């Protein structure tokens, strides 16, 4: 065993954190190693990883990380995080610009944000074990459609700026008959939204035209010149309320698509965009109970009119029925998405912001329509009171209708007013030397309103009762919203707590058992890593606060940039991307810009292996690159002959190749360096997808094997939880020559980034996210993970991740073929179980096996990727031997069940697999007309492995096993019915009656 493993239970000092992050104890690790034929976890690394990869570190198989500190214990790491947090100065930030103070109800913070039942689950691809999240996401969609007055909404996008960009791209697809390639945007758009839109437009060849949409003399000639769409903020960045219906009518007449960017809270009082002629509405739901978090994470939304359902990007939850005819939720219209349509998908988005959408939905359920309206009235009343008081004090407050944002005009005196507010602990929006803006939010109290008025030279005597908003009738909301009973049923803490508990019990998270999804790395999210996320120093910081207020966060960001650069071998890192898919787009856009800067404008071909994740092809398309697919060999490796042929056929046009290492086939390819060399010799760049970096951390570096740029997944490799489908963080690491093309930001307080070998570099590309550093409030999780593990701990985690995958492969290979293996017959951190022979022989499909695993108490592995009819299993280092064996026992038992179907013992149309999963309602039904027992159907895992577990001293009490049973709330969901009868809003209560 390695020294790190031997010290796991030592008596000298506290146990290292890595000994609790890794699931198995020392004796079990020794047993696992001996079972697969190695002497230690370290040996599996040396036997499985090709020497060409291990030797990439100048003959030393230990990655050099000179800035990486040794592992800290939890007390020390927490103390350091407290010190870092103390470097932040949290003021009363009334900056606005898309980020607002909000009050997260404690019942939501405690029962969702801080609850592993919610934050450790995966994207709800398996609907039967995701009904709680899917119900909340349906509520979120109902909330959005109600407030925007449109027909259908998705269940979240990454942030407001990317939602606006997705809206532009949707408009381009939907208005394909329009020949014009021009897209109109309002002059008064948030700066960060404009920059992200411009970046996507540049990548896809769209011409963005800025015009004042409040001035017909400005916008009318632009519309008449032709456009395929328009983006109209409502209210706009100056705070002004205006009616965009005239603009929308004109754009419709030329065949374009109209998009409104809306403040969601304001729509409780304002006419919904759907009633004003918008085809699409986008925006952020951040102010629905989600802290600003120095930029994120937050859930953005998009809603569309009827007829655009198949154009909408991202996840869409629909209502279907299960095998017993009961209503059930599931992801709808998945044929739009990247994992199926690849480069033809509506978007490259994969991870979204499920956890934050759930928080926003819960906030709406908690307050209901009456409560939300009260909050909105309070916000706008206080804003109008402040405006009246400041106007009475002689300040030039813009004479415009507004919801929450006051615009003060001066002649060079804006900074003086800003300084006065800062002295009193308030940070306002200094637009320029002449303009100061104040955005009021729900956290502003009457006392603070008076204090701020005095600081700016006004009199509190002028703050009186509710001010006259004087909004015109055509901007006042008259339609009802949030009328579904769910929005009026849970307004006491007892009822809300129990409702959230019931939904959580419907789901399967890591708090219940292993989630062995291949290519997903569902590892432990330790409590010690999670706790800083909700500290006010991180959660209450505004992303556009002055740089001096963010010293702590900037220090943490710098640490992460340096540590990740050292682990990957690259020169620089950007933490801005909010997901792995966004990281892919960022890296590929940097490559495209790099080629253009050198005059190589013809280099627009991205080579993508046939085995690649669908996101790769979709990201290449979103970055303006043409996808050319490279074949794979029978052993899963890249076909270098086909690669050479594709390079030759596209001579002078190769921009990049996208590869994943280890490969998506779950093996370490020996020829990866040769592949990189071939592309470099053709003038292309090498993008290495970091989705599988958990199998390489501490033992190999992407840059050393030929990579020019990679994205990582902090929500996989570096312990940020998946949140049931987001948040994620997808940082991009790159070599120095690509650094200038990584994303900058128009409002970045620090655009200089550290270089791996010292010095700094500026990232000057278009922003890809609304916030300068993306989702800063979850970065302490990865910082804590790295600080607690240290390099040796990370190496140990990699060793055990690979060890566990090979143990599963070893236990199952006699009954279920392992599709691909690498050198010495080993897999990497995941293995592909080939169920195709079983299906051919028994008729039992991969879907049947996945659903039957639910009865055994497991989330299914990844289905039919990268090969149809297979399961890809990734156990991670966090699972212990008992859980690995429980999974293997279940898989072997399922094989035997399939053989009983093959033998005719059970009919093909009535057996435990075809009927899986078995919800509790079937167990207690009066009739049981199946050729197998209720126990076998509903409790199949109760008696597995008893003798072995007894020998290990484990609890084999069947009562205990029964008590631990996970019950799916529904039977198998009918996906086809759900797509043919598309319903994406909350079903009426009577739908759930018997």
From Swiss-Prot:
Annotated positions of the N6-(pyridoxal phosphate)lysine modification: 716
Family: Belongs to the GcvP family.
InterPro entries for this protein: GcvP, GDC-P_C, GDC-P_N, GDC_P, PyrdxlP-dep_Trfase, PyrdxlP-dep_Trfase_major, PyrdxlP-dep_Trfase_small
Any one GO biological process: glycine decarboxylation via glycine cleavage system
Keyword Oxidoreductase: yes
GO terms under cellular component: cytosol; glycine cleavage complex
Catalytic activity, reaction form: N(6)-[(R)-lipoyl]-L-lysyl-[glycine-cleavage complex H protein] + glycine + H(+) = N(6)-[(R)-S(8)-aminomethyldihydrolipoyl]-L-lysyl-[glycine-cleavage complex H protein] + CO2
UniProt xrefs under Gene3D superfamilies: Aspartate Aminotransferase, domain 1 (3.90.1150.10), Type I PLP-dependent aspartate aminotransferase-like (Major domain) (3.40.640.10)
Needed cofactors: pyridoxal 5'-phosphate
Disordered: annotated segments: 1-20
Keywords linked to the UniProt accession: Oxidoreductase, Pyridoxal phosphate
EC class: oxidoreductase
Subunit composition and interactions: The glycine cleavage system is composed of four proteins: P, T, L and H.
Record-given protein name: Glycine dehydrogenase (decarboxylating)
Function: The glycine cleavage system catalyzes the degradation of glycine. The P protein binds the alpha-amino group of glycine through its pyridoxal phosphate cofactor; CO(2) is released and the remaining methylamine moiety is then transferred to the lipoamide cofactor of the H protein.
Record-listed E.C. numbers: 1.4.4.2
GO terms for MF: glycine binding; glycine dehydrogenase (decarboxylating) activity; pyridoxal phosphate binding
Any Pfam family hit: GcvP2_C
């Amino acid at each position: 065993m390695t020294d790190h493993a031997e010290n796991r239970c030592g008596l000298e000092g506290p146990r290292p954190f890595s000994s609790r992050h890794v699931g198995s104890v020392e004796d079990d690790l020794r047993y696992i190693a001996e079972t697969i034929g190695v002497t230690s976890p370290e040996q599996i690394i040396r036997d499985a990883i090709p020497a060409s990869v291990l030797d990439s570190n100048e003959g030393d198989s230990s990655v050099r990380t000179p800035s990486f500190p040794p592992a800290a214990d939890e007390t020390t790491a927490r103390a350091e995080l407290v010190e870092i947090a103390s470097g932040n100065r949290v003021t009363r930030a009334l900056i606005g610009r898309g980020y607002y103070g909000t009050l997260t109800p404690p019942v939501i913070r405690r029962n969702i944000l801080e609850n592993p039942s919610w934050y450790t689950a995966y994207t709800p691809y398996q609907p039967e074990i995701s009904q709680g999240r899917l119900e909340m996401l349906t509520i979120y969609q109902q909330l959005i459609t109600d407030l925007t007055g449109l027909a259908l909404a998705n269940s979240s996008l990454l942030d407001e700026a990317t939602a606006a960009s997705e809206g532009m791209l949707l408009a381009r697809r939907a208005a394909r008959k329009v020949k014009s390639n021009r897209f109109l945007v309002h002059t008064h758009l948030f700066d960060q939204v404009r920059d992200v839109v411009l970046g996507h437009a540049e990548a896809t060849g769209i011409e963005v035209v800025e015009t004042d949409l409040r001035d017909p003399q400005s916008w009318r000639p632009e519309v008449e010149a032709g456009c395929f769409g328009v983006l109209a903020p409502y209210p706009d960045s100056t705070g002004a309320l205006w009616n965009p219906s005239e603009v929308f009518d004109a754009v419709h007449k030329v065949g374009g698509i109209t998009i409104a960017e809306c403040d969601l809270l304001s729509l409780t009082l304002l006419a919904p965009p759907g009633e004003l002629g918008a085809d699409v509405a986008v925006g952020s739901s951040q102010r629905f109970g989600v802290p600003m978090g120095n930029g994120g994470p937050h859930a953005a939304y998009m809603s569309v009119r009827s007829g655009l359902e198949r154009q909408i990007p991202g996840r869409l939850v629909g209502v279907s029925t299960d095998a017993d005819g009961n209503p059930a939720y599931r992801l709808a219209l998945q044929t739009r998405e990247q994992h199926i349509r690849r480069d033809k998908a509506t978007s490259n988005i994969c991870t979204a912001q499920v956890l934050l959408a759930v928080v926003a939905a819960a906030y709406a359920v908690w307050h209901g329509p009456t409560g939300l309206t009260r909050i909105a009235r309070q916000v706008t009343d206080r804003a109008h009171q402040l405006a009246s008081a400041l106007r009475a004090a002689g300040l030039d407050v813009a004479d415009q209708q507004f919801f929450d944002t006051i615009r003060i005009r001066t002649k060079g005196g804006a900074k003086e007013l800003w300084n006065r507010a800062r002295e009193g602990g308030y940070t306002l929006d200094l637009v320029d030397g002449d303009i100061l803006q104040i955005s009021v939010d729900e956290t502003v109290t009457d006392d603070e309103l008076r204090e701020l008025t005095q600081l700016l030279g006004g009199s509190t005597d002028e703050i009186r009762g509710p001010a006259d908003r004087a909004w015109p009738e055509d901007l006042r909301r008259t339609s009802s919203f949030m009328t579904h009973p769910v929005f009026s049923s849970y307004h006491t803490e007892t009822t809300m707590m129990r409702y959230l508990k019931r939904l959580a019990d419907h789901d399967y998270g890591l708090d219940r058992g292993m989630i062995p999804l291949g290519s997903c790395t569902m590892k432990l999210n330790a409590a010690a890593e999670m706790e800083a996320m909700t500290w006010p120093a991180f959660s209450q910081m505004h992303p556009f606060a002055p740089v001096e207020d963010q010293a702590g966060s900037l220090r943490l960001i710098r640490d992460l940039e340096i540590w990740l650069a050292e682990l990957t071998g690259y020169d620089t890192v950007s933490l801005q991307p909010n997901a792995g898919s966004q990281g892919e787009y960022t890296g590929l856009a940097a490559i495209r810009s790099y080629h253009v800067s050198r005059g190589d404008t013809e280099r627009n071909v991205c080579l993508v292996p046939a085995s690649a994740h669908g996101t790769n092809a979709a990201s290449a398309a979103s970055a303006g690159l043409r996808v050319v697919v490279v074949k794979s060999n029978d052993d899963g490796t890249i076909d270098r002959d086909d690669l050479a042929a594709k390079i030759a056929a596209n001579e002078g046009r190769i921009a990049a190749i996208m590869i994943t290492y280890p490969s998506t086939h779950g093996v370490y390819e020996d020829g990866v360096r040769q592949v990189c060399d071939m592309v470099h010799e053709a003038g292309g760049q090498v993008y290495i997808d970091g989705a599988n970096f958990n199998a390489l951390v501490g033992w190999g570096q992407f840059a050393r094997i030929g990579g020019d740029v990679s994205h990582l997944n902090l929500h996989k490799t570096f312990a940020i939880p998946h949140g049931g489908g987001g948040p994620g963080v997808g940082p991009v690491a790159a070599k120095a020559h690509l650094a200038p093309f990584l994303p900058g930001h128009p409002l970045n307080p620090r655009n200089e980034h550290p270089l791996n070998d010292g010095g700094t570099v500026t990232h000057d590309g278009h922003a890809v996210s609304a916030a300068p550093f993306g989702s800063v409030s979850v970065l302490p999780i990865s910082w804590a993970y790295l600080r607690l593990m240290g390099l040796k701990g990370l190496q140990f985690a990699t060793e055990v991740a690979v060890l566990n995958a090979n143990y599963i492969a070893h236990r199952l290979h006699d009954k279920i073929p392992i599709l691909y293996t690498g050198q010495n017959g080993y897999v990497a951190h995941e293995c592909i179980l080939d169920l195709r022979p079983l299906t051919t022989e028994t008729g039992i499909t991969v879907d049947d096996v996945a659903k039957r695993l639910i009865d055994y108490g497991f989330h299914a592995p990844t289905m039919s990727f990268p090969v149809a009819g297979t399961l890809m299993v990734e156990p991670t280092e966090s699972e212990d031997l008992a859980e690995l064996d429980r999974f293997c026992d279940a898989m072997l038992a399922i094989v035997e069940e399939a053989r009983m179907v093959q033998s005719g013992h059970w009919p093909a149309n009535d057996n435990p697999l075809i009927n899986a999963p078995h919800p509790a309602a079937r167990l207690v039904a009066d009739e049981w007309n199946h050729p197998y027992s209720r126990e076998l159907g509903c409790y199949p895992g109760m008696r597995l492995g008893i003798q072995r577990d007894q020998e290990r001293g484990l609890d084999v009490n069947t009562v205990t096993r029964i008590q631990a049973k996970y019950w799916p709330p529904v039977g198998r969901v009918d996906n086809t019915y759900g797509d043919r009868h598309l319903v994406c809003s909350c079903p009426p209560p009577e739908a759930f009656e018997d």
